């Protein structure tokens, strides 16, 4: 049996905001059928104002339109490159480029992360919702574990009822594997800050909205922990890079929680192997051995990915 490792997250109608449940089912039902022919942010915000009065509903509707109608296109990276001689010229070109990106994103329905974030920010501005774009580093794959910090992504934070709502419309729109696969998801909407930090590290750390500071180096060394309800300290090894010689001799993995299904793991070959579990209460441990070279280890709870490690 073979599985391609991707970040699999559940799409939910109800979002849990820091322990409080808010029912978005009505908003989603209406916004899902918004026209895909809108050509400006003003058309979108005007429609949202007609349908919803609460800021949290308006924000959800705006996010819904963006993730359902904008396709990820890496060629957009090359569209807005420019040169400048002095800072004033740079600032003017940046402002002009920003407007061009927003217009092109809505009109042509394609963008990279910058277009997704800027367009949603502009719609929020027209809805009088306080929102701002965040630039930072993200982990998409095990190959991102251990590398230096890079400002390679943009997402957005809105402040509603004095609470930050963290969201990534780019990741929420779908995934890109050779081409764009449209898969609108709320898995990256109103994400719990400590879970978001597993994969998104802001350039200005205050934008993480977590109590305890985490260094860029620590973020870089974390493994990829997928499920929202599992904390980093519930899994051992805690470092995301493991040595092949340790894997060859037998690497012990410990989970401080009870898996829902049979634990499986896979290497580069994609073949799922069943783990020989040793359980003690809700905790479980097992040993993984590799007979040949591999660049990664991915552990699954049934068909749901739990954690991934880079092997060197």
Predicted regions and their residues:
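Bacterial Sec-dependent N-terminal signal peptides
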Residues: 1-22
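A generic alpha-helix surface/boundary motif
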Residues: 12, 39-43, 118
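Secondary-structure boundary elements
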Residues: 20-109
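Residues embedded in well-ordered secondary-structure elements
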Residues: 51, 145-147, 244
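Alpha-helical and coiled-coil interaction segments, frequently adjacent to or embedded
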Residues: 177-312
């Amino acid at each position: 049996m073979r599985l391609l490792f991707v970040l699999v997250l559940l799409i939910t109608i109800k979002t849990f905001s820091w322990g409080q449940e808010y029912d978005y089912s009505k908003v989603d039902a209406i916004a899902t059928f918004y026209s895909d022919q809108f050509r400006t942010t003003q058309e979108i915000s005007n429609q949202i104002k007609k349908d919803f009065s609460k800021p949290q509903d308006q924000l959800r509707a705006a996010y819904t339109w963006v993730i359902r109608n904008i396709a990820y296109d890496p060629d957009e990276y090359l569209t807005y490159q420019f040169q400048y001689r002095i800072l004033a010229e740079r600032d003017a070109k940046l402002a002009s480029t920003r407007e061009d990106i927003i217009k092109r994103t809505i009109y042509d329905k394609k963008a990279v992360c910058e277009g997704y974030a800027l367009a949603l920010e502009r719609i929020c501005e027209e809805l009088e919702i306080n929102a701002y774009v965040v630039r930072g580093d993200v982990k998409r794959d095990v190959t991102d574990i251990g590398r230096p910090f890079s400002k390679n992504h943009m997402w957005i934070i809105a402040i509603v009822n004095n609470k930050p709502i963290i969201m990534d419309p780019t990741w929420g729109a779908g995934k890109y594997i050779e081409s764009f696969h449209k898969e609108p998801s709320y898995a990256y909407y109103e994400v719990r800050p400590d879970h978001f930090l597993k994969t998104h590290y802001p350039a200005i750390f205050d934008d993480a909205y977590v109590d305890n500071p985490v260094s860029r180096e620590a973020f870089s060394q974390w493994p990829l922990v997928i499920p929202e309800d599992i904390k980093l300290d519930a899994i051992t090894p805690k470092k995301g890079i493991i040595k092949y010689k340790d894997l060859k001799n037998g690497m012990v993995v410990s989970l401080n929680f009870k898996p829902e299904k049979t634990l499986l793991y896979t290497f580069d070959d994609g073949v799922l192997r069943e783990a020989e579990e040793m359980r003690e209460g809700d905790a479980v441990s097992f040993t993984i051995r590799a007979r040949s070279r591999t660049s990664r280890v991915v552990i699954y709870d049934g068909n749901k990915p739990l954690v991934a490690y880079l092997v060197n």
